[in-house]
Amino acid sequence: MTENFILGRNNKLEHELKALADYINIPYSILQPYQSECFVRHYTKGQVIYFSPQESSNIYFLIEGNIIREHYNQNGDVYRYFNKEQVLFPISNLFHPKEVNELCTALTDCTVLGLPRELMAFLCKANDDIFLTLFALINDNEQQHMNYNMALTSKFAKDRIIKLICHLCQTVGYDQDEFYEIKQFLTIQLMSDMAGISRETAGHIIHELKDEKLVVKDHKNWLVSKHLFNDVCV
């Protein structure tokens, strides 16, 4: 039984490493020699995946689920990153290691592949293709951060909420032709926290969008019409 368990664990790890190899566009054979340094872990909704700088020695590949990364600067400001499966994180300090105060939490049940940050940095130095791919991903990460900040600059609360919903659809939404689907985790409280407005105001705006058939609550998921984004999407 022990041998079967180890075999199953190794097969799972190999499968996820192949997924990572596809994501960063390299042959699996480049990662295979380092399989023993990697791990696969499962997290339940609400569980902390890491809190840096104490746990910043790993890079993670999100295999399944949704996460929120809350980055705290020296002034106490909070920057939120939302991610769904098929993303590598955190990579902003990959080439310039520094302490980053970032809390990463599972918004839904999640599965992640972990590997040492030093290993990824070494692979980048040894392989130009990996470096170029990671550099492009870092730029995408910065663009996401910029879009989030642009949404927060909207003068009117309703515009701010709409742009934040648009931002979430683009980052963690699932394209379903006429609408986007956002899984489980989105709540009125989270929207009010993101927009910096009261829960009551956020709830009133969402209610208006529901009346206009632009947002529909389907069980715990949100269905967002693409008509919502006309002329306001950042």
Curated annotation (Swiss-Prot):
Q: Which residues bind a nucleoside 3',5'-cyclic phosphate?
A: 40-129
Q: An example of a Gene Ontology BP annotation on this entry?
A: regulation of DNA-templated transcription
According to its UniProt entry, what is the function of this protein? Positively regulates the expression of the arcABDCR operon under anaerobic conditions, by binding to the consensus motif 5'-TGTGAN(6)TCACA-3', thus playing an essential role in arginine catabolism. May also control the expression of genes encoding proteins which are involved in anaerobic metabolism. Can bind cyclic AMP.
**Residue ranges: DNA binding:** 188-207
The UniProt entry's GO CC annotations, sorted and at most eight, read: cytosol
Which InterPro entries would you find in this protein's record? cNMP-bd_dom, cNMP-bd_dom_sf, HTH_CRP, RmlC-like_jellyroll, WH-like_DNA-bd_sf, WH_DNA-bd_sf
Main location per the UniProt record: cytoplasm
What does the induction field say? Answer: Induced by arginine and anaerobic growth during the stationary phase. Repressed under aerobic conditions independently of the growth phase and by glucose catabolic repression.
Top-level taxon: Bacteria
- Every copy of the HTH crp-type domain together lies at 155-228
Quote any Pfam family the record assigns: HTH_Crp_2
Localization annotation: Cytoplasm
Write one Gene Ontology MF term.
DNA-binding transcription factor activity
Keywords, A to Z, come to: Activator, cAMP, cAMP-binding, Cytoplasm, DNA-binding, Nucleotide-binding, Transcription, Transcription regulation
The name under which this protein is listed is HTH-type transcriptional regulator ArcR
